UniProtKB/Swiss-Prot annotation:
Keyword match Thylakoid: no
Gene that encodes it: trpA
Reactions accelerated catalytically: (1S,2R)-1-C-(indol-3-yl)glycerol 3-phosphate + L-serine = D-glyceraldehyde 3-phosphate + L-tryptophan + H2O
UniProt-recorded name of the protein: Tryptophan synthase alpha chain
GO cellular component: cytosol
Organism: Chlorobaculum tepidum (strain ATCC 49652 / DSM 12025 / NBRC 103806 / TLS)
Keyword Amino-acid biosynthesis among UniProt keywords: yes
Catalytic residues of the enzyme: 47, 58
Pathway in which the depicted protein is active: Amino-acid biosynthesis; L-tryptophan biosynthesis; L-tryptophan from chorismate: step 5/5
Amino acid sequence: MKENRITRLVKQDKKLLIAYYMPEFPVPGATLPVLEALQESGVDLIELGMPYSDPIGDGSVIQDAAHKAISHGVHVGSIFELVRRARNGEGCKKITTPILLMGYCNPLIAYGGDCFMADAVKAGVDGLLIPDLPPEESEDFLERAKHFGLSVIYLISPVTPPDRIELIDSMSTDFSYCLAVNATTGTGKLDVAGMDEKIAEYLKRVRQHTKKKFVVGFGIKDRERVRKMWELADGAVVGSALLQHVATAKTPEETAELAAGFWKSLR
């Protein structure tokens, strides 16, 4: 079995800049041009959202994007097809960037666990982040993911106790994902303009109780915030800000152009 692209990525001595994108947002046909634009603009890893009608942990930006994606016919199978086309260079330049799917348990269960993982790997997916799947209840899931060669990422929050941080670190395949605030995504409550002491202390605590790398997301909108998160973590995730930036696009080409311009501004 070939080494997972995410595993290869985290072995590099670099700070990561990770994009979260909802497929076919804001217009049908936007996904492949956006993936190409992000890759050409220096993205390190791409999280693709799996839209769900009741995304409890997501803020209004991602909820709206999910509803629009669903209205454009996006479902698990269509995401696999988009990833397959991206990997084969059909409709865009060949995408070699690691791809992580992020979404809730229900669509995965409805598809069928092993079938989901087999089809994900066949399409070219590298990893999974399932926010509503607690590590304590996911030993079988983790074992099956390992069997299929998928990286699994778990979430850490500011209220996660040290012993649970250590558990999450041990169970995450390559890195953990830290929520910067105890809030829904994209709320913009992350006070990194003044480098909030609580966030700094929280991420220092995570560092003390982890052996693997960890990235931080939620509320990161510009180059200054990316840089400040890089000082405390191994990577920064930008999602809601990217979706907001492309939301007014009327065509796939305009979406890709806006995505590229925004992403270059973060570097």
